[in-house]
């Protein structure tokens, strides 16, 4: 394997100034997500979701909806992820849009989506 210690990217596209931030962080998040979609990034709605049940677990999931202050992703309640969230609902996540030199981090308590919303989503998925 080649030496990776020297790998480093200089980020120069745009600085983020605290004084320029909107009062509602969802305004900026939705703007950035829209720009990632318009830039045709691969899976711009993908984010790393971390759960913790005494030790951390992280995996990539897909954002499926935004209704501030809620971000929606779906999982099988019986999956490892679903079981971890049921036991300990605090989660953290990070969207990374490298080509745009942006990331968005968040943390909060995960809870099940309303049944109707969940049923509608799962009914829309293709059968395999």
Residue spans of the language-model regions?
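Binding-site signature for planar aromatic cofactors or substrates
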Residues: 1-128
């Amino acid at each position: 394997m080649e030496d990776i210690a020297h790998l480093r990217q200089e980020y120069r596209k745009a600085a983020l100034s605290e004084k320029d931030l909107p009062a509602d962080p969802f305004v900026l998040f939705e703007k950035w997500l829209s720009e990632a979609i318009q830039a045709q990034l691969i899976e711009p709605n993908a984010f790393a979701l971390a759960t913790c049940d005494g030790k951390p677990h992280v995996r990539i999931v897909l954002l499926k909806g935004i209704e501030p202050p809620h971000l929606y992703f779906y999982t099988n309640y019986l999956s490892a992820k679903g079981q971890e969230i049921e036991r300990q609902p605090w989660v953290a996540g990070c969207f990374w849009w490298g080509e745009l030199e942006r990331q968005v981090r968040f943390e909060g308590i995960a809870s099940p989506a309303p049944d109707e919303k969940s049923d509608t989503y799962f009914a829309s998925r293709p059968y395999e």
